[in-house]
Amino acid sequence: VALRNLLDKACNSQELKMSYITLDFETYYSKEFSLSKMTTEAYIRDPQFEVIGFSYKVDDAPAQWVTGSNGEIAMALEELDIPNHYLICHNMAFDGAILAWRFGIIPKYYLDTLSMSRPITGLTVGGSLKALAEKFTDGHKGNEVVNALGKRRSDFTPGDLDNYGNYCNNDVELTWTLFHILKKDNPPKELYIQDLMIRMFTDPVLELDRDVLIAHLNNVQDKKAKLMERIDLSIGRDALMSNPQFAEVLKKLGVEPPLKTSLRTNKEAYAFSKTDYEFKALLEHPNTAVQAVVAARLGIKSTLEETRTESFLGISERGALPILLNYWGAHTGRASGGDKMNLQNLPRGGALRRSIKVPDNHV
């Protein structure tokens, strides 16, 4: 409440001046080690992770580029006194998590231009800094990041680092400009909610019970194997490719087969293709047997329950459970799941819910 009141005053008072730091990290990535291949959580917590440098802007001062060893980066961040500033980033889940998990720094307040943009654009523009800068500002995002593929900091020439720094400085200036445009349509109470959602990810508290997860994964895989064995002995796994026979399998599992109107014949037909939304939705059916047969039909090796459990196990090896909810992630305005996980729809009473633990002194 005190934090919310402070933000209310800061946003509505001409007399109270907040001090802002706008920040952007540039990090090592390769074809295999990148956010396109991994979750944000796994990427940042991985031993391969490296900060190439970062740019920062204190209030209206020009953006500055900092590069160096991990120790030098840490020292520069420490000198900025970020815990006593309001931090502005684009895609705060990324930059905020780097600050928190790699350098132990939590700002006074998170202000994320990506979250701020969603209710304004209605999810039609895209959330990239490039797309938003082109819509709301006269600035343009560079493409020097493409030249950084597969390069550690030690692989950059001094000239390359200068160019990368100019690119990063430009990103920070664009983010600062974007923030002032977007904040007009983001009331303090919404900024407060955005901050809370970011903190759920950057400053996680919940832990995962590995014993529960391991037992559950073994149980799910065992049930799937036995189910597929029964199918092999009865109709044969190849029969899953037969629409009528697969429809009977679904009916025996208590699921009414989805239907569609065939474009070719204009007659009703089973909707069992990879492009049929209602059919693909069965991959998330609460009955893991339904998940298994649908996954087998689609040629998917792992069911959703297996994938979720394996994901939880991976997180449990790396630390606490960060929960990323995308503010205004759906067109209705509700939050959506982020970082390839949605803890809003875990099955009630399931093992995944039971695996989430609250540490001592947090209840």
Language-model segment annotations:
Residues A2-C11, Y109, P188-E190:
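Catalytic phosphate/metal-binding cores of nucleic-acid and nucleotide-processing enzymes, i.e., regions
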Residues L6, Q14, Q64-W65, N70, ...:
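Compositionally biased regions
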Residues L6-C11, M18, E144, T265:
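Generic signature of intrinsically disordered, low-complexity, basic-rich segments
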Residues Y20-T22, S30-K37, I44-I181:
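Conserved DEDDh/DEDDy metal-dependent 3′-5′ exonuclease domain
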